[in-house]
From Swiss-Prot:
Location of the protein in the cell: Cell membrane
EC code: 3.1.-.-
Domain called KH: residue spans: 209-272
Protein name, entry field: Ribonuclease Y
Similarity field: Belongs to the RNase Y family.
Domain annotation HD: ranges: 335-428
């Protein structure tokens, strides 16, 4: 029993080992097969990826090749175009040179023809001169025979007539010299005035009756006019200024004789253009705001002016009236600038004579104060100025200076005389005041017209603001003696036909040039 059991156990062990071996072998075979399959799959995927990379590399290479080829073709094309342009320029330059060569050949031929014509004309002129000399000699002989006068006797008669004419001119010139000598008798006073003028110089503002407002574009003109013109009518009604909207690009012209109103309208219109909202209510608001700004500017101008001159304790109302003079002009001269200039000049003159400099400056600054409001109150600016100075309790010397600076009242102090002198200096210095532009231009044109009406005058120029006329004559027609006679004749016509202040200098210029070239 034990033997059978052992044998059975051994057989079972052997069978189990065999079954285990077979099972393990199958498992191993299966793993090997799976591993081979995985390996084959990996190899296949590697081949596919390698093929894809190969194709991608080929595509990139083709793209690079195409890009390089395109760039090369563009470069070649640009170079061809540049070469073509250079070739065209060379061809054009060659054509220009050919045309210039043809032109030069034509000019050379023309010059040769002209030279030949000039030679023939010179020969003809020489023949004519010879005939003229013979004719003049025969005419002189015939005149001597007819008039029963020799050449010397006729010459004596002509010289006597010229001598009489010159005697008249000499008498006139002598009288003018005497007048100038009398004017030179005040040399010392002129030296003092000249010193004062040299120590002070003021700028000058030209008179104008228009202002210009720049616009961002021409479409703004339609907005300024408004529907049926209501905006422009509102602005003109509120300011009293005419708005001129014409073909001037991006600009509107404001026209009016009251500078304060014109400045108010200018500020209001600039604010409206900047704001963009333009309608009657907004216009009224901006005009009122601009009026306040102008009033503030007037006040600040008065304060700054008194500070600049060094005047203290001036009444605030008088200071504001002083600021209004910034917007007044007289013959092209700004009244405030003129008053500042008179104040400085009066102070300098007072310092030279040992008078009160501060009081002289105060009187000079306020001498034209009436001009600030003379269009609002009846009476001359002198009367209004005296009334204002009295109202605000100014110094009696200041009041007398205002009253007497135009000679309406007798001056009772040295300072009043100095203020009148400074006023005359400021108004009379060259460039301070101007006449009407139209009259000024007409006078200059008449000067040149008179000068150019004489035979032998080549050109004339009115210079120094019409205080001198320079006449350039043709030297072959006007000799030196004729130049003096021409200057006298033009001077007489100017005196007879023109009205002008001061003197006009007549200068005749005769120039002869002889030019030779050494080779």
């Amino acid at each position: 029993m034990d033997g059978i059991t052992i044998i059975s156990a051994l057989l079972g062990l052997i069978v189990g080992a065999a079954v285990s071996y077979i099972y393990m072998k199958k498992v191993n075979d299966s793993k090997i097969t799976g591993a081979k399959h995985v390996a084959e799959t990996i190899v296949e995927e590697g081949k596919r990826e390698a093929e894809a990379l190969k194709k991608e590399a080929l595509l990139e290479a083709k793209d690079e090749t195409h890009k390089f080829r395109t760039e090369a073709e563009n470069d070649i094309r640009e170079r061809r175009l540049e070469l073509q342009k250079q070739e065209n320029r060379l061809l054009q330059r060659e054509e220009n040179l050919d045309r210039k060569d043809d032109t030069l050949n034509k000019r050379e031929a023309s010059l040769e023809r002209k030279e030949q014509a000039l030679a023939e004309r010179q020969q003809h002129i020489e023949q004519m001169e010879s005939k003229v000399d013979e004719l003049v000699a025969s005419q002189k002989t015939e005149l001597e025979r007819i008039s029963a006068l020799t050449r010397e006797e006729a010459k004596s008669i002509i010289l006597n007539e010229v001598e009489k004419e010159l005697a008249t001119d000499i008498a006139v010139m002598t009288k003018e010299a005497e007048t100038r000598a009398k004017e030179d008798s005040d040399k010392k006073a002129r030296e003092i005035l000249s010193l004062a003028l040299q120590r002070f110089a003021a700028d000058h503002v030209a008179e104008t009756t228009v202002s210009v407002v720049n616009l961002p574009n021409d479409e703004m003109k339609g907005r300024i006019i408004g529907r049926e013109g209501r905006n422009i009518r509102t602005l003109e009604t509120l300011t009293g200024i005419d708005l001129i909207i014409d073909d001037t690009p991006e600009a509107v012209i404001l026209s009016g004789f009251d500078p304060i109103r014109r400045e108010t309208a200018r500020l209001a219109l600039e604010k409206l253009v900047q704001d963009g909202r333009i309608h009657p209510a907004r216009i009224e608001e901006m005009v009122e705001k601009s009026r306040r700004e102008v009033d503030e500017q007037i006040r600040e101008t008065g304060e700054q002016t008194t500070f600049e001159i060094g005047i203290h304790n001036l009444h605030p109302d008088l200071m504001k009236i002083l600021g209004r003079m910034k917007y007044r002009t007289s013959y092209g001269q700004n009244v405030l600038k003129h008053s500042i200039e008179v104040a400085h000049l009066a102070g300098l003159l007072a310092a030279e004579l040992g008078e009160d400099v501060a009081l002289a400056r105060r009187a000079g600054l306020l001498h034209d104060i009436g001009k600030a409001i003379d269009h609002e109150v009846e009476g001359s600016h002198v009367e209004i100025g005296v009334e204002l100075a009295t109202k605000y309790k100014e110094h009696p010397v200041v009041i007398n200076s205002i009253a007497s600076h135009h000679g309406d009242t007798e001056a009772t102090s040295v300072i009043a005389v100095l203020v009148a002198a400074a006023d005359a200096l400021s108004a009379a210095r060259p460039g301070a005041r101007s006449e009407t532009l139209e009259n000024y231009i007409r006078r200059l044109e008449k000067l040149e017209e008179i000068s150019e009406s004489y035979d032998g005058v080549e050109k004339s120029y009115a210079i120094q603001a019409g205080r001198e006329i320079r006449i350039i004559v043709q030297p072959e027609k006007i000799d030196d003696l004729a130049s003096h006679r021409l200057a006298r004749d033009i001077r007489k016509r100017i005196e007879e036909e023109l009205d002008y202040p001061g003197h006009i200098k007549v200068t005749v210029i005769r120039e002869t040039r002889a030019v030779e070239y050494a080779k």
